[in-house]
Amino acid sequence: MASAMVCCARLGWRARYVGRFGSDELGDIGRTSLTNEGVDVSAAEVVAGAQTRFAMIIVDGRTGDRTVLWDRDPRLALSAADVPAAAVRTSRILLVDCDDVEASVAAATVAREAGVITAIDVEAVLPGLDRLLPLIDIVIASEGFPERWTASSETGRALERLHAELQPALTCVTLGPQGSLARCGGREIRTPAFRVPCVDTTGAGDAFRGGFIAALLQHGPEDVDVLLRMANAVAALKCRTAGAREGLPHAAELEALLAEDTRGTGVPQ
């Protein structure tokens, strides 16, 4: 989530992170790194005595694929009462994840009432998602989620069923080197990935979501193909460099890739 906000900030948009840090050195580093990237952390809380979430990432040097090992201090969890409603109401787009489903439900409810666009980063089938997902305008799922949610074995059919059930403006699944597959209205849109040297895929999903949000802010919702192409380009550029954020592009880098490579054009079905 934090990396998606950094992505938006690098592409020229104001971004705010809502969450919790521990009162440790890693927490100080995390807050400072976001502030240095131009992300507003005024709505983020420091929890006394808690340890900041830490992950160990193992990267396959041949493919750039990664395995993530992590643990989270339960004191970092957000409840519905912890949601800063004023910060949500003054946003243009709210992106939530599923770390704290009740908090995400509360935030999405406030956003809906205020006319704020809602988006979600969803990976796993969790308790409470049946209440959260209907509040979402833009569903961006990780590979495998549509199949798990719908008990359908084929990705395209699973995404179609997910979209029909939830009826958001857009339902999308990221597919790594295969790009993305989305449904918007009655259309299925396959967007190929951009071909770049892949060093590390860590954070590619955050990059895709941040790239999509930045594209939506820039271009509006009319041409979904353009938004998906930009999101795929941002994710590809991130994978050039090790680390979750180091490769996140600035606007000039993104524009250069979009100008030189036309293979990420959406293919409507």
Give the positions of each predicted feature:
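Active-site glycine-rich loop that binds ribose-phosphate moieties when present
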Residues: 75-84, 102, 120-128
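Conserved phosphate/ATP/ADP-binding segment of small-molecule kinases
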Residues: 105-190
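Alpha-helix C-terminal capping segments
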Residues: 5-14, 215-218
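Conserved phosphate-binding/catalytic region of the ribokinase-like
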Residues: 154-269
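Aromatic/hydrophobic pocket-lining residues that form π-stacking "cages" and hydrophobic walls in ligand
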Residues: 4-5, 30, 104-109
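Conserved N-terminal subdomain of the carbohydrate kinase-like
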Residues: 10-92, 255-269
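Conserved donor sugar-nucleotide recognition element shared by glycan-biosynthetic enzymes
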Residues: 1-4, 26
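Glycine- and other small-residue-rich loops at beta-strand/loop junctions that grip anionic moieties
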Residues: 19, 96-97, 121-122
